[in-house]
Protein backbone atom coordinates (compact mmCIF):
# COMPACT_ATOMS: atom_id res chain seq x y z
CA UNK A 1 0.00 0.00 0.00
CA UNK A 2 2.83 2.39 0.91
CA UNK A 3 4.56 1.62 -2.41
CA UNK A 4 1.36 2.49 -4.33
CA UNK A 5 0.99 5.75 -2.38
CA UNK A 6 4.61 6.70 -3.02
CA UNK A 7 4.27 5.81 -6.70
CA UNK A 8 1.09 7.89 -6.98
CA UNK A 9 2.80 10.81 -5.22
CA UNK A 10 5.83 10.56 -7.52
CA UNK A 11 3.59 10.41 -10.60
CA UNK A 12 1.53 13.37 -9.39
CA UNK A 13 4.66 15.41 -8.72
CA UNK A 14 6.07 14.54 -12.14
CA UNK A 15 2.84 15.53 -13.88
CA UNK A 16 2.61 18.76 -11.90
CA UNK A 17 6.22 19.62 -12.76
CA UNK A 18 5.63 18.80 -16.41
CA UNK A 19 2.55 21.01 -16.41
CA UNK A 20 4.54 23.92 -14.99
CA UNK A 21 7.20 23.48 -17.66
CA UNK A 22 4.73 23.92 -20.50
CA UNK A 23 4.56 27.25 -22.32
CA UNK A 24 1.94 29.60 -20.93
CA UNK A 25 -0.17 31.94 -23.05
CA UNK A 26 -0.14 35.67 -22.30
CA UNK A 27 -1.97 38.80 -23.46
CA UNK A 28 0.14 41.94 -23.73
CA UNK A 29 -1.02 44.40 -21.05
CA UNK A 30 -2.19 47.28 -23.21
CA UNK A 31 -4.99 48.31 -20.84
CA UNK A 32 -2.64 48.78 -17.89
CA UNK A 33 -0.21 50.74 -20.09
CA UNK A 34 2.60 48.26 -19.59
CA UNK A 35 3.36 48.07 -23.31
CA UNK A 36 5.48 50.40 -25.45
CA UNK A 37 6.71 50.44 -29.05
CA UNK A 38 9.07 53.41 -29.28
CA UNK A 39 11.26 54.48 -32.17
CA UNK A 40 14.12 56.80 -33.02
CA UNK A 41 15.14 58.09 -36.45
CA UNK A 42 17.77 60.58 -37.56
CA UNK A 43 16.56 64.06 -38.49
CA UNK A 44 18.80 65.36 -41.29
CA UNK A 45 21.85 63.91 -39.54
CA UNK A 46 21.72 66.62 -36.85
CA UNK A 47 19.49 65.11 -34.17
CA UNK A 48 16.94 62.35 -33.60
CA UNK A 49 13.17 62.28 -33.69
CA UNK A 50 11.71 60.08 -30.96
CA UNK A 51 8.21 58.69 -31.12
CA UNK A 52 5.87 55.93 -30.09
CA UNK A 53 2.85 54.00 -31.31
CA UNK A 54 0.02 54.31 -28.81
CA UNK A 55 -2.33 51.60 -30.10
CA UNK A 56 -1.04 48.05 -30.37
CA UNK A 57 -1.67 44.70 -28.79
CA UNK A 58 -0.71 41.10 -29.05
CA UNK A 59 -0.28 37.70 -27.51
CA UNK A 60 2.65 35.44 -26.78
CA UNK A 61 3.47 31.97 -25.45
CA UNK A 62 6.46 31.64 -23.15
CA UNK A 63 8.25 29.04 -21.05
CA UNK A 64 11.48 30.25 -19.38
CA UNK A 65 12.80 26.66 -19.43
CA UNK A 66 12.25 26.38 -23.21
CA UNK A 67 12.45 29.89 -24.70
CA UNK A 68 12.98 28.47 -28.19
CA UNK A 69 9.34 27.26 -28.09
CA UNK A 70 8.09 30.83 -27.54
CA UNK A 71 5.80 32.55 -30.04
CA UNK A 72 4.63 36.15 -30.37
CA UNK A 73 2.00 37.85 -32.49
CA UNK A 74 1.62 41.65 -32.46
CA UNK A 75 -0.63 44.07 -34.36
CA UNK A 76 -0.06 47.81 -34.36
CA UNK A 77 -2.31 50.64 -35.60
CA UNK A 78 -0.04 52.87 -37.70
CA UNK A 79 -2.29 55.94 -37.23
CA UNK A 80 -1.46 55.83 -33.50
CA UNK A 81 2.01 57.26 -34.24
CA UNK A 82 2.96 60.07 -31.83
CA UNK A 83 6.11 62.23 -31.94
CA UNK A 84 4.86 65.10 -29.75
CA UNK A 85 4.39 67.37 -32.81
CA UNK A 86 1.01 67.25 -34.58
CA UNK A 87 2.20 68.54 -37.97
CA UNK A 88 5.10 66.08 -38.06
CA UNK A 89 2.77 63.22 -37.07
CA UNK A 90 0.44 64.21 -39.91
CA UNK A 91 3.36 64.28 -42.38
CA UNK A 92 4.79 60.91 -41.27
CA UNK A 93 1.29 59.40 -41.48
CA UNK A 94 0.79 60.74 -45.03
CA UNK A 95 1.46 59.04 -48.38
CA UNK A 96 5.01 60.42 -48.19
CA UNK A 97 5.90 57.87 -45.51
CA UNK A 98 3.61 55.42 -43.66
CA UNK A 99 0.44 56.06 -45.72
CA UNK A 100 -1.75 55.03 -42.78
CA UNK A 101 -4.95 55.44 -44.81
CA UNK A 102 -3.81 52.66 -47.16
CA UNK A 103 -1.83 50.62 -44.60
CA UNK A 104 -3.63 51.02 -41.24
CA UNK A 105 -1.86 48.11 -39.53
CA UNK A 106 1.61 46.71 -39.09
CA UNK A 107 2.02 43.13 -37.91
CA UNK A 108 4.82 41.00 -36.45
CA UNK A 109 4.62 37.20 -36.25
CA UNK A 110 7.57 35.29 -34.82
CA UNK A 111 9.00 32.38 -36.79
CA UNK A 112 11.92 31.33 -34.55
CA UNK A 113 13.47 32.07 -31.16
CA UNK A 114 17.15 31.35 -30.52
CA UNK A 115 18.58 31.70 -27.01
CA UNK A 116 21.70 33.86 -26.90
CA UNK A 117 22.20 33.94 -23.13
CA UNK A 118 20.55 33.16 -19.81
CA UNK A 119 17.90 35.86 -20.30
CA UNK A 120 18.42 36.92 -23.92
CA UNK A 121 17.30 35.64 -27.30
CA UNK A 122 17.08 36.55 -30.96
CA UNK A 123 13.43 36.56 -32.00
CA UNK A 124 13.12 36.19 -35.77
CA UNK A 125 9.82 36.94 -37.40
CA UNK A 126 7.94 38.43 -40.30
CA UNK A 127 7.16 42.15 -40.06
CA UNK A 128 4.46 43.48 -42.37
CA UNK A 129 4.76 47.25 -42.71
CA UNK A 130 3.56 49.52 -45.51
CA UNK A 131 2.17 46.47 -47.33
CA UNK A 132 5.55 44.70 -47.43
CA UNK A 133 6.49 41.61 -45.39
CA UNK A 134 10.16 41.09 -44.51
CA UNK A 135 12.00 39.02 -41.90
CA UNK A 136 13.54 40.95 -39.00
CA UNK A 137 15.38 39.99 -35.82
CA UNK A 138 14.48 41.45 -32.43
CA UNK A 139 17.18 41.27 -29.75
CA UNK A 140 15.04 40.32 -26.74
CA UNK A 141 15.69 40.36 -22.99
CA UNK A 142 13.53 38.46 -20.50
CA UNK A 143 13.10 40.78 -17.49
CA UNK A 144 11.32 38.35 -15.18
CA UNK A 145 7.99 36.79 -14.27
CA UNK A 146 5.79 36.30 -11.24
CA UNK A 147 2.52 36.96 -9.47
CA UNK A 148 1.11 40.48 -9.54
CA UNK A 149 -0.88 42.24 -6.76
CA UNK A 150 -4.18 41.68 -8.62
CA UNK A 151 -4.12 37.88 -8.61
CA UNK A 152 -2.60 37.46 -12.05
CA UNK A 153 0.73 36.22 -13.33
CA UNK A 154 3.00 38.35 -15.54
CA UNK A 155 6.11 38.08 -17.67
CA UNK A 156 8.07 41.09 -18.97
CA UNK A 157 10.40 41.66 -21.91
CA UNK A 158 12.39 44.33 -23.73
CA UNK A 159 13.50 44.17 -27.34
CA UNK A 160 15.40 46.21 -29.91
CA UNK A 161 15.67 46.08 -33.67
CA UNK A 162 16.79 48.31 -36.52
CA UNK A 163 14.70 48.57 -39.67
CA UNK A 164 15.84 49.73 -43.09
CA UNK A 165 12.83 51.72 -44.28
CA UNK A 166 13.72 51.14 -47.95
CA UNK A 167 13.11 47.42 -47.37
CA UNK A 168 9.46 48.29 -46.70
CA UNK A 169 9.03 50.73 -49.59
CA UNK A 170 9.26 53.79 -47.32
CA UNK A 171 11.54 56.59 -48.47
CA UNK A 172 13.19 58.54 -45.68
CA UNK A 173 13.59 62.31 -46.05
CA UNK A 174 17.35 61.96 -46.59
CA UNK A 175 20.26 59.52 -46.61
CA UNK A 176 20.67 59.68 -42.82
CA UNK A 177 16.98 58.86 -42.28
CA UNK A 178 16.80 55.42 -43.86
CA UNK A 179 17.12 53.40 -40.66
CA UNK A 180 14.70 53.38 -37.75
CA UNK A 181 15.63 52.03 -34.32
CA UNK A 182 12.85 50.23 -32.43
CA UNK A 183 12.73 49.87 -28.65
CA UNK A 184 9.95 47.58 -27.41
CA UNK A 185 8.97 46.95 -23.79
CA UNK A 186 5.96 45.04 -22.49
CA UNK A 187 4.40 42.92 -19.79
CA UNK A 188 2.07 40.08 -20.57
CA UNK A 189 -0.72 38.85 -18.32
CA UNK A 190 -1.10 35.07 -18.32
CA UNK A 191 -4.41 33.85 -19.71
CA UNK A 192 -6.51 31.90 -17.22
From Swiss-Prot:
Which UniProt keyword terms apply here? Answer: Periplasm, Signal
Pfam families xrefs: YceI
- Superkingdom to which the source organism belongs: Bacteria
- Which InterPro entries does the record associate with it? Lipid/polyisoprenoid-bd_YceI, TTHA0802/YceI-like_sf, UPF0312/YceI
The family classification in the record reads: Belongs to the UPF0312 family. Type 1 subfamily.
Q: Which NCBIfam families match?
A: PRK03757.1 (NF002994)
Protein name in the entry = UPF0312 protein PSPPH_0448
The organism of origin for this protein: Pseudomonas savastanoi pv. phaseolicola (strain 1448A / Race 6)
- Identify the taxonomic lineage of the organism of origin: Bacteria, Pseudomonadati, Pseudomonadota, Gammaproteobacteria, Pseudomonadales
Amino acid sequence: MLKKSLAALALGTALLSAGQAMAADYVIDKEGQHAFVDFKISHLGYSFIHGTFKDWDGTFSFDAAKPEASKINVELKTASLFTNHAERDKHISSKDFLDVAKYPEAKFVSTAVKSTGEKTADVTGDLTLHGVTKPIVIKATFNGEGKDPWGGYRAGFNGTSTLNLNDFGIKGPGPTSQTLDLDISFEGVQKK
